[in-house]
Amino acid sequence: MNSYSHNHTTAAAASGARPSRRRIGILALLAVGTMINYLARTVLGIAAPQLTAELGIDAAMMGIVFSAFAWTYALAQIPGGIFLDRFGNKVTYFLALTLWSLFTLFHGLAVGLKTLLLCRFGLGVSEAPCFPVNSRVVSAWFPQQERAKATAIYTVGEYLGLACFAPLLFWIMGSFGWRALFISVGAAGVMFALVWWRCYREPHEDKHLNQLEREHIVNGGGMSTGAEQHTAFSWPLIRQLLAKRQILGASIGQFAGNTVLVFFLTWFPTYLATERHMPWIKVGFFAIMPFLAAAGGVMFGGWVSDKLLKATGSANLGRKLPIIAGLLMASTIISANWLTSDLAVILVMSFAFFGQGMVGLGWTLISDIAPKGLGGLTGGLFNFCANLAGILTPLIIGFIVAASGNFFYALIYIGGAALLGVAAYVFILGDVKRIELSQ
């Protein structure tokens, strides 16, 4: 800290001034953006019954439509990360938000399978930078000891968005049809993109950030001075990043967590209806419970992580331990194979999904270890590996269920993937510290 900043901060503290709370407003922007992100990608599930009937799309083709998003979403992670490092948080998120909202809106204009697939492909590409931007913004705006809680707050939008807005979305579809559903969500996203452009600033540019809050961020390891230089992309950078055990271990762990998440986003209602023989009304009621539990897991994981980091000063304990515990909890999904009570099954599923929610801390860990100037590329690599689960999990579970006629081995696969994540964090990841790359 230079002498001017030190004297300025000391004088402010002596006069009784308090740090501003501008970073909370920035976090609110991320939380709303993440909620819109997940609404845009999952609203197809609500529209599917009306949409398939009107467009004449059968179940097999609809499965391809559901998976189309994950293909381009994963493939666009690295290019999206490069773009983010080149153009920064504000421009990247504004363009991504605007484009994914327009592609969501265009779903409402689809006339057949081909146009619907084009919309899904476009949605996947345009949503790709969202979580790398989130991670990069948290790294800039929050000291290390607050990042897990901040990550948890925006991540909870993944689970609560659809649950909170489902009644409104069903009402829109029931009153105006499935096309109005996509148009409404898309229009809301475009409007929020304008809010983002108007409100977001980097810490060193934000006039609402006072000196005390600025020093709080900088002293805690936030990249808020504006002095960080963009690192030009080159293929050797990717090789160097992939060679780092921290990146490999964290990516495998996140892939494991996403395997559990994708099961709940895709096959879980079918599991309840066909394996547990629940009527659809009961499925609708019970399916909400694990998602509420997962939201609790996200918040609990963030709280525990920051508490551990503050109490011990160890990023290894503060970041790794909650994720390992969460993956172990997620692996208990296997035990549902031997339960006969529907309530017991839902409780086990909720416990497992609570644990999966804690794995969202992986983004906090990435913000801690990403090389300076390469937060976007690092986040893109990490998210690419994690979202391979979005491609593989629905296909593998579908093959298992088709071959065996039940979900017994499917649940073993999901639990086994969670245990693979535990092994990656214990034996591969190593120390949680910022990576230094050779020039």
Protein language model regions, located:
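Helix-breaking motifs and short loop linkers at transmembrane-helix boundaries and internal kinks
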Residues: 56, 88, 109-115, 126, ...
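Cytoplasmic helix-loop-helix junction between adjacent transmembrane helices
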Residues: 119-159
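Extracytoplasmic
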Residues: 25-59, 264-269
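A late C-terminal transmembrane helix in Major Facilitator Superfamily
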Residues: 367-404
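Conserved MFS/SLC helix-loop-helix module at the cytosolic interface between two early adjacent transmembrane helices
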Residues: 75-113
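Extracytoplasmic gate region of multi-pass secondary transporters
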Residues: 44-45, 242-299, 359, 363, ...
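Helix-loop-helix hairpin linking two adjacent transmembrane segments in secondary transporters
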Residues: 154-207
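C-terminal transmembrane helical hairpin of 12-TM major facilitator-type secondary transporters
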Residues: 316-362
